[in-house]
Every structure is written in structure tokens, then in C-alpha cells.
């Protein structure tokens, strides 16, 4: 059994213009768990820092118990500090090898008060796209799906889009180890980086 996670690295301003490039998933070896985040920037990073520096946890099942209360607190502070709009949200995904040595995953959504929601086994994507039939190469399959995601999002009104860009990073977790690597770079990465630098 294994778990693979793929993300882009582009973080945008509310208007969709490039802001920074960041790591959107992190691996905590002592918990055998990958944490990934979407939506409002910084929520995942604060949660990972808290788990790593200020909590005693036995594994992902223990994390699922403690996540709601702690994420609600982190979210409330972010709402007050940054005056977040009502339509701004955050989702945190937790994927790992459990205390019972089984693959397990759950998500915590601001739209559901950060309750721990168990994820089913199999593929999961955000935003929506189709799975490439018959593809056996992970890197190639992810590249196909992300290209389709970008195409779908480009067809939507600007204020409804999820922006994807920068580089694609992949994490591959097994019971014994976790590897991460850069899978590919989006064709407009350099242009996005130039735009981001202008905003500083």
C-alpha cells in the first residue's frame, strides 16, 4: 500500500495574480503522515508547526481526534488578523500510515467547521478533472490531469477560478519511507515568477 500526493506551488492574490511560490504539502516522519492544504495560505503551515513543536501525538488517528479544535482556533485567529472574506476557505488533507499500520486519510474543511472527515481509498482530485485511462506512469498521469485542470479553470469567470502553476511536486509515502521530488515545471512558470516579483 502507498499514498501519492501531487500539488502545484503557485499561491495567488485574491485577484488571481501570482503572489509567491510555496510548498503545499509537508511530511512529518514521526507521524508517518503527509499534510496538504488548499485555500487560504498559511493555515496548513501553522497547523504543521503546531503538531511538530507543541503536541504529543501517536499518529494520524490521534491527529484526527485533535485536529478540529486546533484548526478552529488557527482559523479564528486568521479570520481576525486578515479580515478574511466569507467566501475564503481552507481545506487540510491528512494522509498517512496509521497507528494500526494501515493507510488512512481524512480532511478538515473550514466549510464543515474543521470536523475530521474520513477519505475513501482511491484517487481524489481538486479541482475537478478526469483520470487518464490506462496511464501507469504517475508523473505523466499527473501532468495530464493538471493540464486539464488548468484548461477547465481558464474557462471559468476570473473570480471563480482556482489558479494552478509554478512547479508540480510529488510525495510518495509507503510504510517504510517517503520520497518527494519535482515532477515538472509549468510552461508559464517564469512569467508567473516575474509577475510575483513585481508585486513585492
Predicted regions and their residues:
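Short beta-strand elements
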Residues: 94, 107-112
Amino acid at each position: 500500500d502507498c499514498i501519492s500526493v501531487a500539488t502545484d506551488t503557485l499561491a495567488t492574490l485574491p485577484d488571481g495574480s501570482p503572489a509567491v511560490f510555496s510548498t503545499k504539502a509537508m511530511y512529518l516522519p514521526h507521524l508517518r503522515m503527509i499534510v496538504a492544504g488548499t485555500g487560504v495560505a498559511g493555515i496548513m503551515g501553522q497547523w504543521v508547526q503546531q503538531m511538530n513543536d507543541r503536541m504529543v501525538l501517536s499518529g494520524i488517528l490521534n491527529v484526527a481526534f485533535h485536529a478540529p479544535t486546533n484548526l478552529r482556533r488557527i482559523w479564528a485567529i486568521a479570520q481576525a488578523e486578515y479580515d478574511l472574506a466569507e467566501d475564503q476557505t481552507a481545506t487540510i488533507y491528512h494522509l498517512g500510515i496509521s497507528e494500526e499500520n494501515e493507510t488512512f486519510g481524512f480532511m478538515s474543511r473550514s466549510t464543515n467547521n474543521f470536523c475530521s472527515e474520513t477519505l475513501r481509498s482511491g484517487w481524489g482530485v481538486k479541482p475537478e478533472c478526469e483520470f487518464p485511462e490506462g496511464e501507469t506512469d504517475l508523473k505523466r498521469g499527473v501532468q495530464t490531469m493538471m493540464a486539464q485542470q488548468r484548461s477547465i479553470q481558464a474557462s471559468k469567470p476570473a473570480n471563480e477560478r482556482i489558479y494552478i502553476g509554478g512547479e508540480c511536486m510529488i510525495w510518495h509515502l509507503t510504510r517504510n519511507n517517503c520520497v518527494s521530488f519535482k515532477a515538472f515545471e509549468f510552461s508559464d512558470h517564469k512569467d508567473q515568477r516575474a509577475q510575483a516579483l513585481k508585486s513585492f
